[in-house]
Amino acid sequence: MTYSQVLASIQSTSWPDFAVFYIFLGGAMTCLGLSSTFHTVSCHSEKVCADWNRCDYIGIVTLIVGSFFPMIYYGFYCAPLLQAIYLGMISLFGGATIVVAVASHFRSPEFRWFRTGLFIAMGLSAIFPIAHALIIYGWRLCFDVISLNHMLLMGSLYISGALIYGARVPERWFPGKFDIWGSSHQIFHIFVVGAALVHYYGVTKTMAYWHAQNHSCQKEIELMVPS
């Protein structure tokens, strides 16, 4: 089921539903757009390569932050204060990550694992809102209210891709064999696209669940039925 199909099937959606989805979608498009531009122009000159490499890092952060928005919005659908706290947390974390990632000092090859670890840590900060949601709703209901299974799969894909990229596998084992196809960077991008698609599907399921079960926030959590 696509996002458009979900919107067409329910009447209770409002502007925040559109906003959080398009923030996520915009983050994904920004990430992939900046990355593809970087790879296209990186051979132009050292300066152009360095400038667009910074844009590439900014795109990664934008995707991570954008992915948080629908998860936090629906995870705390009836708790605006918690929404604000966690959205503020990831936004500040994202801003700090951009400042560090684009600094000239940290762009050198010897800081590759530092940058990789920074992006992984940023993604793993989702543990805090997810743990909070588990306390509020319980394990079973979280598969619906935040689409926990999709969240876990998405996180696994992002982390796996980042580790492959950081380890430079498989080209480190077979130098010169993956210069055109099959390099770690290409594998990383495949994992990123897969994770974004998984999250897209999870967001549509979560939105459909909330609007079917408790869109007005008048039902007690104990009365919400797992799908």
Regions inferred by a protein language model and the residue ranges of each:
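Multi-pass alpha-helical transmembrane bundles in non-GPCR membrane proteins
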Residues: 1-227
